[in-house]
Structure formats: structure tokens, C-alpha cells
Amino acid sequence: PVYEVSKGEKVLFIGDSITQGYGTFETGQTFVNVANRALDYELLNQGIGGYYFDKNSLMPLEKFVPDKVIIAMGTNLCYWDDKEKYIAGFFEKLPSVYGKTPILIITPLWRADYPDAFDKVCEVRALIEKFSLPLKNAKVIHGDLLVPHDEKLYFDKLHPNAAGGKIYGENLVAKIKEIKF
């Protein structure tokens, strides 16, 4: 016999190489997959290495209309002089694509690949908070609180390894439940 599989909410993850899972080298240990085992979403992971807040990439999907969107990126803009322009443009366009869809925005994780890296993460986080504030359908959580600031949890002081991905996913689930997203 064939049984129909029940599917949870449709959730679109938009992000960079961390969302894609680079650094874990174990598909099951990416934070997206760890979280999904507990949340049981029907998900589409659009994590792309090198991705940043590019408004031109925002467009409605025809074959996957999400019930929720989770955006997790920003670290690739840390050292860009014009990062504000990109972050502002992305969040200005976002309502035209996902204006009524609940959105969770995860700011960049802690990183230690350069001496001033975390200061740069905090700059990006402040810009994300500033430009997402007008969005009534969005909630922001600090990514640097989801993975401990411990180099042993990172493959290269930037991308979480399998242990870091597991912790990230578990902490994300707890946060999603806490804020009722």
C-alpha cells in the first residue's frame, strides 16, 4: 500500500554558504536540516555560497509558494564599503515579494577569521535591524546567539562545522518556538 505523507508548512530558506551547509560536510548536520527534523517543514533551501542581500534576486516562486520565509545571511557583506546600499535595497523590495508572508531574519553568526570580524558582523546586524524594522511581518533574531563563540564549532572560523551546525539548528528550533514563528 501507498500512504500519503503529511507535509508541514512550506518554508523557504534564503541565505549564503552557511545556509547552504558549507563547512559541515555532512548534509544531515546543516542547521537547516537539523532544524527541519524537529519542525517538519516542507522546505526549499536556497542557500547559495557567496550570496548577499541582492534585491535583484528577490522574485516570487511559481512552484513553491512559502507559508514562511527564513532569511539567514549578511556575513558576505561585512567588508563591503557599500553594504548599506545592498541591505536597504533588499529590505525595501522584500514586501513586494513576501509582503504578507511571515519572515524570520537571522543576522550573521559570530566569526573570527579576521581580528575585527565580529565588529563587522555587528555593523551588518545593525543595518539589518534598521532596514527590516518597517516590516510588520518580520522578526529578527541575532545569529551570533545561536552558535557559541568557540572556534572548535567552526570549520574555518566562519562556517559552522558539523557540531556547530547541530547546535545552530537546535538553538534555532528553540528560538522559533520561543517567539512562536
Question: What are the functions of these language-model segments?
Answer:
Residues 1-65:
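Serine-esterase "nucleophile elbow" of acetyl-processing enzymes
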Residues 51, 55-181:
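Alpha-helical cap/lid subdomain in secreted, periplasmic
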